[in-house]
UniProtKB/Swiss-Prot annotation:
Species whose genome carries this gene: Bos taurus
Lineage of origin: Eukaryota, Metazoa, Chordata, Craniata, Vertebrata
Biological processes per GO annotation: cellular response to cell-matrix adhesion; cellular response to nutrient; megakaryocyte differentiation; negative regulation of cell population proliferation; negative regulation of epithelial cell proliferation; negative regulation of G1/S transition of mitotic cell cycle; positive regulation of transforming growth factor beta receptor signaling pathway; regulation of G0 to G1 transition
InterPro entries recorded: Ank_Repeat/CDKN_Inhibitor, Ankyrin_rpt, Ankyrin_rpt-contain_sf
The protein, known as: Cyclin-dependent kinase 4 inhibitor B
Quaternary structure and partners: Heterodimer of CDKN2B with CDK4 or CDK6.
One GO CC annotation: cytoplasm
Gene name of the encoded protein: CDKN2B
Function field: Interacts strongly with CDK4 and CDK6. Potent inhibitor. Potential effector of TGF-beta induced cell cycle arrest.
PROSITE patterns reported for this sequence: ANK_REP_REGION (PS50297), ANK_REPEAT (PS50088)
Length: 131
């Protein structure tokens, strides 16, 4: 396991670094996947978006796929869409992540994917609209 600020801080740090095995160990040890870190963010909000496996582990252990950043109203699906990580976006969506919620600027995840030129992500989001 990681060492540092305790299990909750370690989980956020491991998720942010995409450390699948450390995330697995911490979750199996009972660390709360929804606990806020010292910056007021949850592991699923700070996770390495390119690691769909980290997302899947957090979600399997009860992470909330719809937690919103209090300042920007972005959710993990917004982040995955903006960065173009289709596998992570699909994992979030399958776990109940809402694709129809706007951020503080009125943008949907599909808008962010299109702005960044992530055609495969935008195509998925358009195809699943209305789920």
């Amino acid at each position: 396991m990681l060492s540092g600020g305790g299990g909750d801080a370690d989980l956020a740090n491991a998720a942010a670094r995409g450390q699948v095995e450390a995330v697995r160990q911490l979750l199996e040890a009972g660390v709360d996947p929804n606990r806020l870190n010292r910056f007021g963010r949850r592991p699923i909000q700070v996770m390495m978006m390119g690691s769909a496996r980290v997302a899947e582990l957090l979600l399997l252990h009860g992470a909330d796929p719809n937690c919103a950043d209090p300042a920007t109203l972005t959710r993990p699906v917004h982040d995955a869409a903006r960065e173009g990580f289709l596998d992570t976006l699909v994992a979030l969506h399958r776990a109940g992540g809402r694709l129809d919620v706007r951020d503080a600027w009125g943008r949907l995840p599909v808008d962010l994917a299109e702005e960044r030129g992530h055609r495969d992500v935008a195509r998925y989001l358009r195809a699943t609209a209305g789920d």
